[in-house]
């Protein structure tokens, strides 16, 4: 089958607070589609306000997938995302509908569109050794070690992200090659679909920065801190879990632990979200084949639907 004959899939990418979720709903309505979330935080139940999760009404109007599939105590790997997304794409297409992939987790998009590197399996003994060193010296010391071994990976991985930090060190110890080298050398897979790429982004960083601040203040008014308090009171969650490391949640957790005051929490959360958006925008610059649309443009959904129809 030639590339032109492959079933089409809308791939809607953009930084946080750019309006992707609303545009995805409008596209799905216009094109008889179903939405597949490409967001590492929307998979968690009980994390609604801080993730800007589509409302029950919105999800009832348009089918959404990969939302509310895990408890916050669980881990959702990139490999699992890829497997489940491919299965959903096949199912939606088989039912004669159009898959609309929408989100901002660029690692997931990259894994789906460009494939996963072939990495060694986890080594329990080595992991225990790394965890013992972390308990003795702290994860920041291990992050400094990773920075010497694999600077690009260290730049991507936060010192307070033990899961990814441990994996990067484990891969190097097992193979003698850095995670960055192995990922760079991975081959692009033959996709079973034809991606129709769309990038939605505000006109400038200043506009995006203001949208982020406004949205976070609105989340606070809607009860975001109370949402995190409910997670905090459970007693079985901690800041090393991927769910609690999500932007905004991590800063709220620190406030609830008494690490800093409310004003500092708000400031840190907004700054962290802006930094996250900057990393997303850097990644999106690679999407030279995508149709770029500006957030807030009059007639945005009509234009996006027209672009997709022209390429179906």
From Swiss-Prot:
The record marks 105, 127 as: Interaction with substrate tRNA. Pfam families: IPPT. Keywords: ATP-binding, Magnesium, Nucleotide-binding, Transferase, tRNA processing. ATP binds at residues 14-21. The keyword Transmembrane does not apply. Its EC number is 2.5.1.75. Substrate binds at residues 16-21. This is tRNA dimethylallyltransferase. It comes from Methylococcus capsulatus (strain ATCC 33009 / NCIMB 11132 / Bath).
């Amino acid at each position: 089958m030639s590339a032109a004959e492959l079933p089409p899939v809308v791939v809607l990418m953009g930084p946080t607070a750019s309006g992707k979720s609303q545009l995805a709903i409008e596209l799905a309505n216009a094109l008889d589609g179903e939405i597949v979330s490409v967001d590492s935080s929307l998979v968690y139940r009980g994390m609604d306000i801080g993730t800007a999760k589509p409302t029950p009404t919105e999800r009832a109007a348009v089918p959404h997938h990969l939302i509310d599939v895990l408890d916050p105590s669980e881990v959702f790997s990139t490999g699992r995302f890829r497997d489940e997304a491919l299965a959903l794409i096949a199912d939606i297409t088989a039912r004669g509908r159009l898959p609309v992939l929408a989100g901002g987790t660029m690692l997931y998009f990259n894994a789906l569109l460009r494939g996963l590197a072939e990495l060694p399996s986890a080594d329990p003994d080595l992991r225990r050794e790394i965890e013992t060193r972390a308990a003795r010296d702290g994860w920041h010391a291990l992050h400094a070690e990773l920075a010497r071994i694999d600077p690009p990976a260290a730049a991507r991985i936060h010192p307070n992200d033990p899961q990814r930090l441990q994996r990067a060190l484990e891969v190097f110890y097992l193979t003698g090659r850095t995670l960055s080298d192995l990922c760079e050398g991975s081959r692009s897979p033959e996709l079973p679909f034809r991606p129709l790429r769309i990038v939605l982004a505000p006109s400038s960083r200043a506009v995006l920065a203001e949208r982020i601040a406004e949205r976070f203040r609105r989340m606070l008014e809607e009860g975001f801190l109370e949402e995190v308090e409910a997670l905090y009171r459970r007693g079985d969650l901690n800041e090393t879990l991927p769910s609690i490391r999500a932007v905004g949640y991590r800063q709220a957790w620190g406030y609830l632990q008494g690490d800093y005051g409310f004003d500092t929490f708000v400031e840190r959360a907004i700054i962290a979200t802006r930094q996250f958006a900057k990393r997303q925008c850097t990644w999106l610059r690679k999407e030279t084949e995508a149709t770029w649309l500006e957030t807030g443009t009059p007639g945005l959904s009509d234009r996006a639907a027209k672009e997709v129809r022209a390429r179906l």
